[in-house]
């Protein structure tokens, strides 16, 4: 509504021109780059390119006018304000004097328009915001549903996850034990009295200064932990694992400098190097295509398919060396053959590889007392027991896969493995379980 300027018909109510100091008459110009205060010019000063201090003649500008309809197509904004001012001056019902003061409308038009828009239906159907927009903007009267927050997690006191979080209490946003927790002990016996000597007084003040420096260090460490999101360590580690191995090594090296550059700058630095790594890998792939004489992506897809086929053939030729490892154990050899048959038929290996000399398969994980168990259903508990995965880690992996699936509209196994980066067999079982239960969909 800035372009309305002043609706008043009195020129003295409008701001003066900065060029000639005359009263502004619509339309006039407002500089869009200067201000505050706003920089107004009349048309004459604007056309001759008036400049003053920081204002230049090539600045962008706005045309200030009230010559447009607001409530009725046949009434301009200037006439609306003139009608209201005339009613205030002449009184309600004195429509002849109102029309004489306006000069542009008859008394019948003034009465009809005023009664319609300001008495019978004031500012509802005729305002700039229609009823539909007003209904959408209306605040709902229903209760706001409550959703428990899991970030940061709220483990039970003295649980394993609580110890991993250094005793952090999310409800209080503080720790059970502070850094340098006994810093206050040095002050417990200090008492300032008037008969202290200058040396003793200076010594006590030095102890207080040391205590203040220890408090500053405590707050500095808290700020670093909060700014960098180190409260939920497992979530932090999960985010770190989404990078390739080379970027993870850089992440580990540069972590000690994160407190210096700040969280945003540190994340930008890591993301830029991750992008650089992706670009280098893509350049290397394109160089491989060019070395092989490939100049278009259609041929590149054929090349990748044939290369993958050659790799599979090479792996099959090395199976003999694997068989030789179990040649002395007939039972293990039969298990290996059945496992390879399942793989060739596209099934997951149903027989785990064991040998008389090897270790036994691990028993199912006991979930009793582990944090997060109460958030799992029976099928999820069974999955965590079989793959020996703690509930907290499973919930983080599940959340990461769900977010990625919603973002991409589907998820492939290769994407899941690149995202959570744990044992590939465990990843496959988690991925198959989430697909089977309908949590995610295949891409």
UniProtKB/Swiss-Prot annotation:
Residue intervals of every ZZ-type zinc finger in the record: 12-69
Compartments it resides in: Nucleus; Chromosome
DNA-binding residues: 426-435
Its job: Component of the ATAC complex, a complex with histone acetyltransferase activity on histones H3 and H4. Required for the function of some acidic activation domains, which activate transcription from a distant site. Binds double-stranded DNA. Binds dinucleosomes, probably at the linker region between neighboring nucleosomes. Plays a role in chromatin remodeling. May promote TP53/p53 'Lys-321' acetylation, leading to reduced TP53 stability and transcriptional activity. May also promote XRCC6 acetylation thus facilitating cell apoptosis in response to DNA damage.
Lineage top rank: taxon: Eukaryota
Binding site for Zn(2+) 1: 17, 20, 42, 45
GO cellular component, one term: mitotic spindle
Keyword field: Chromosome, DNA-binding, Isopeptide bond, Metal-binding, Nucleus, Phosphoprotein, Transcription, Transcription regulation, Ubl conjugation, Zinc, Zinc-finger
Protein name: Transcriptional adapter 2-alpha
Lineage: Eukaryota, Metazoa, Chordata, Craniata, Vertebrata
């Amino acid at each position: 509504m800035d372009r309305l300027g002043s609706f008043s018909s009195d020129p003295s109510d409008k701001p003066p021109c900065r060029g000639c100091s005359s009263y502004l008459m619509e339309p006039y110009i407002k500089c869009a780059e200067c201000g505050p205060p706003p920089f107004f010019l009349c048309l004459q000063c604007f056309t001759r390119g008036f400049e003053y201090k920081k204002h230049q003649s090539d600045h962008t500008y706005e045309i200030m006018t009230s010559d447009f309809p607001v409530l009725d197509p046949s009434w301009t904004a200037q006439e609306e304000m003139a009608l209201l001012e005339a009613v205030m001056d002449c009184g309600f019902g004195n429509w002849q004097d109102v029309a004489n003061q306006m000069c542009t409308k008859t008394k019948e038009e003034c009465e009809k328009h005023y009664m319609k828009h300001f008495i019978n239906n004031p500012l509802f159907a005729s305002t700039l915001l229609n009823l539909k927009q007003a209904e959408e903007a209306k605040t709902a009267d229903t209760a706001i549903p409550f959703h428990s927050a899991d970030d940061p997690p709220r483990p039970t006191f003295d649980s394993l996850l609580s110890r991993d979080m250094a005793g952090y209490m999310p409800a209080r946003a503080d720790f059970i034990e502070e850094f340098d927790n006994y810093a206050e002990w040095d002050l417990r016996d200090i008492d300032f009295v008037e008969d202290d000597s200058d040396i003793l007084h200076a010594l006590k003040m030095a102890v207080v200064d040391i205590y203040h420096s220890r408090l500053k260090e405590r707050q500095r460490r808290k700020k670093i932990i909060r700014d960098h999101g180190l409260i939920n360590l497992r979530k932090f580690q999960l985010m770190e694992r989404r990078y390739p191995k080379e970027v993870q090594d850089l992440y580990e090296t540069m972590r000690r400098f994160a407190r210096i550059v700040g969280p945003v700058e540190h994340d930008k630095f890591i993301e830029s190097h991750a992008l650089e790594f992706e670009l280098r890998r893509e350049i290397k792939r394109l160089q491989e295509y060019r070395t092989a004489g490939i100049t278009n992506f259609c041929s590149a897809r054929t090349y990748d398919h044939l290369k993958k086929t050659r790799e599979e053939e090479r792996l099959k030729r090395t199976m003999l060396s694997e068989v030789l490892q179990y040649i002395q154990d007939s039972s293990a050899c039969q298990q290996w053959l059945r496992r390879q048959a399942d793989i060739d038929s596209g099934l997951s290996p149903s027989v785990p590889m064991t040998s008389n000399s090897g270790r036994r398969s691990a028993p199912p994980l006991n979930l009793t007392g582990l944090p997060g168990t109460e958030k799992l259903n029976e099928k999820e508990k069974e999955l965590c027991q079989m793959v020996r995965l703690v509930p907290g880690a499973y919930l983080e992996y599940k959340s990461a896969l769900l977010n990625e699936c919603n973002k991409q509209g589907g998820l492939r196994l290769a994407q899941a493995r690149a995202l959570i980066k744990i044992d590939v067999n465990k990843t496959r079982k988690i991925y198959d379980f989430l697909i089977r239960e309908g949590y995610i969909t295949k891409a």
